[in-house]
Amino acid sequence: MSSLASQGNNASTPAYRYGFQTSEVGDRPTVSMPSQPESSAMLEDDGMVKRKPFAAIGEAIPKVIDTTGESVREAFEEFLLSFSDDRVAGGDALPSASQEKYYVQQIHGLAMYEIHTVYVDYKHLTSYNDVLALAIVEQYYRFSPFLLRALQKLIEKFEPEYYRSSLSRENASLSPNFKASDKTFALAFYNLPFRSTIRDLRTDRIGRLTTITGTVTRTSEVRPELAQGTFICEECHTVVSNVEQAFRYTEPTQCPNELCANKRSWRLNISQSSFQDWQKVRIQENSNEIPTGSMPRTLDVILRGDIVERAKAGDKCAFTGILIAVPDVSQLGIPGVKPEAYRDSRNFGGRDADGVTGLKSLGVRDLTYKLSFLACMVQPDDANDKSGADVRGDGSQGIEEQDEFLQSLSQEEIDDLRAMVHSDHIYSRLTNSLAPSVYGHEIIKKGILLQLMGGVHKLTPEGINLRGDLNICIVGDPSTSKSQFLKYVCNFLPRAIYTSGKASSAAGLTAAVVKDEETGDFTIEAGALMLADNGICAIDEFDKMDLSDQVAIHEAMEQQTISIAKAGIQATLNARTSILAAANPIGGRYNRKTTLRNNINMSAPIMSRFDLFFVVLDECNESVDRHLAKHIVDIHRLRDDAMQPEFSTEQLQRYIRYARTFKPKLNTESCAEIVKKYKQLRMDDAQGAGKNSYRITVRQLESMIRLSEAIARANCVDDITPAFVNEAYSLLRQSIIHVERDDIEVEEDDAEAQELENDNTNTTNGNDNVSSEEALQKPKVKITYDKYVSIMNGILQVLRQRSTEGVDGVPAGDLVQSYLELREDQFHTEEDIIYEVGLVRKVLTRLVHESIIMEIQNLTDSAVRLPFEERVFSIHPNCDIDALLSNGDVPN
């Protein structure tokens, strides 16, 4: 047994403090010099010391022996051989006789899955030998070669064929002393007990095993990195193999041939060199880790081997590895000047010496180094969201993904999930558990729940992707909890981005093309929509965005892609995200006397891309105000005790993750119901009932399908029923807020008023109680706006029908008669018909004044005023009757 195991936990002895037996002085390895022949140490007769040939004195080179490192290697090798996990994934204990060692199983799996990395749980290492664990953490960079040597020895022992296959035949036949590359196999440690932020990294962490967390903002392409180089001397063609590359291109210092003095002329033999995958990612501090008033800091992380392409832009990841100092390429030299070291030959002691100028001459060192992180392990940062690391999941694998998710849960979690699925009224209970700090707004909570569930992504035979994600916009008065919903969703989902519309540009939302400071190449830096891929992008103050910036997200909202053609880069990037937007009405408060389109600063294409619009009004209601005030006061007084939802956040995350594995489909009844509801929406829109929201298009039909699928997922069923379609229809109708209009005053024209005045005069027989002013006043009638629009639409429909038949004008009598026939089902008594005729006459007069219709004058005698029934009316040539009938708006 190694000295490490015999020392146990006695870490108080120096070197030495890890409990290792060592012959070092201090903590430095000893240098053992082998005995030399006396003749080899003698000087030549001429007194000059000649250079010894490298090959001839191979045994005479001083050899450094790190006894502490050897002890670590032996102890780590014993750990890999001896450690056995007491419990398997299912939680059942296995007999020790039938259980194979934990890491020996991993070594056997290397050849099976053709991987090169063994993953070591730091908790296992601590429980087995805490002294060894402490030594590896504090001096990982020093002990890393010894740990890899121990791993290679075990791979050679248990999987000799796979170990030999890692060597190229050329290298194996090149030299009998050729050994396996240290870069071929790798170790990855995880589950370290402590995590650091980017801001905590200092130079004292260099070389120590550390876990850092951050959000990935940029990833480079995977490139080959030279791990072990084989060089050929250009002068004598001697081959030098196994030249380790230490963070830069490293050539041999001198040719080993005793007859060759070459030190610079080398040619790399690519076929006999070993390469490994290399990738650089840039991470940024998480938003909750940035101190007040500070800018977020970034750090470059180097990934090698099997862990490349594990971190995507927008992922919150935990990286385990070591902090290293590398040259800062961007600071090494001035453009056009080759950076090189030279000696200042000026004679400052002479008579012609100039004064000392500049900080460099005063001894200030150049800052030409920066910190980077060399990672050996990449994991999702699920420290705060234990069950919500991938809440949304794409649901593309169906049953297989469902089984895989259930296998990742414990038995207790599975029982709890089963109870939730089989409970009654789960849809409404899930809604009430969302955003418990926000009082009321059940309709908005339903929409957010369905957005988290999402619809089913589809692919047409032509290869066109049909999105399943839902886009929601919340419009309302100030202080109606719009931003609270956005914050809640960002905290609920691990892959959610919060941004503000006023502070966001088009490039910041989509993607930007930036120039890499090291290579000089143009690369794509992800924007908010790319970072929220497979998540939700919450955009607050959406109405404050410039219209040019709103146009930039048209493609992302519908096609869920971002196309870029800049700086020689043509790319189409994925932005499979849902957008949750919040907007304030124009003027601060929602005006119920105008349409939704006129209340918000959005273009029609943007509005049609939102599946749901929720309008929140701050109305005075004594009961609602009392309950709302009590809820807010309880939160300030009792904190978390005031919010007691039925389901916790972890339960909601598990349920949503499980529900997204379902792929519900439409049946015959639900298809017929969707067609029926869509026809009803279009009919209401054509008749003016939907004028207060936006035009109903085919996108609203697709929205109804996506909402129905999301409701089916919320109920964990595979079939969409007509009841789900009706619920989706009712949600879609929520955005159609009734527009309050002032009553319309209609009156008779001057001739009709004069006739009525004469009749009144003859009737009163000179009654002195009626003043002359009242007699001259024209009679006015107030009708509701909806009634006015209904009569106007009926009149215009009759005129347009006659116009298509070739009739230029319609007499008023025929026009009124045709209108009454069109609406005959609305009249029950003769008094209703007489009253309606009077209203139609007054509306005709107003339509003439508003230049919607015009009266055709009598060509024979224009001075003679015809009776009302004989007057001829036609559509005014300046009136756009199609637009007027589509939205129902009339000039004021």
Curated annotation (Swiss-Prot):
Residues 759-769 have a biased composition (Low complexity). GO terms for biological process: DNA replication; double-strand break repair via break-induced replication; double-strand break repair via homologous recombination; mitotic DNA replication; mitotic DNA replication initiation; premeiotic DNA replication. Residues 426-633 form the MCM domain. It is an enzyme of class 3 (hydrolase). The keyword Nucleus applies. ATP binds at G476, D477, P478, S479, T480, S481, K482, S483. PROSITE patterns: MCM_1, MCM_2. Its EC number is 3.6.4.12. Transmembrane segments: none annotated. The modification Phosphoserine is found at S96, S98. Keywords: ATP-binding, Cell cycle, DNA replication, DNA-binding, Helicase, Hydrolase, Nucleotide-binding, Nucleus, Phosphoprotein. GO terms for molecular function: ATP binding; ATP hydrolysis activity; DNA binding; DNA helicase activity. GO terms for cellular component: chromatin; cytosol; DNA replication preinitiation complex; MCM complex; MCM core complex; nuclear pre-replicative complex; nuclear replication fork; nucleus. It is found in: Nucleus. Residues 748-774 are annotated as: Disordered. It catalyses: ATP + H2O = ADP + phosphate + H(+). A motif (Arginine finger) lies at residues 608-611. PANTHER family: DNA REPLICATION LICENSING FACTOR MCM FAMILY MEMBER, DNA REPLICATION LICENSING FACTOR MCM6. Component of the mcm2-7 complex. The complex forms a toroidal hexameric ring with the proposed subunit order mcm2-mcm6-mcm4-mcm7-mcm3-mcm5. The heterodimers of mcm4/mcm6 and mcm3/mcm5 interact with mcm2 and mcm7. Interacts with sld3. Acts as a component of the mcm2-7 complex (mcm complex) which is the putative replicative helicase essential for 'once per cell cycle' DNA replication initiation and elongation in eukaryotic cells. The active ATPase sites in the mcm2-7 ring are formed through the interaction surfaces of two neighboring subunits such that a critical structure of a conserved arginine finger motif is provided in trans relative to the ATP-binding site of the Walker A box of the adjacent subunit. The six ATPase active sites, however, are likely to contribute differentially to the complex helicase activity. Belongs to the MCM family. This is DNA replication licensing factor mcm6. It comes from Schizosaccharomyces pombe (strain 972 / ATCC 24843) (Fission yeast).
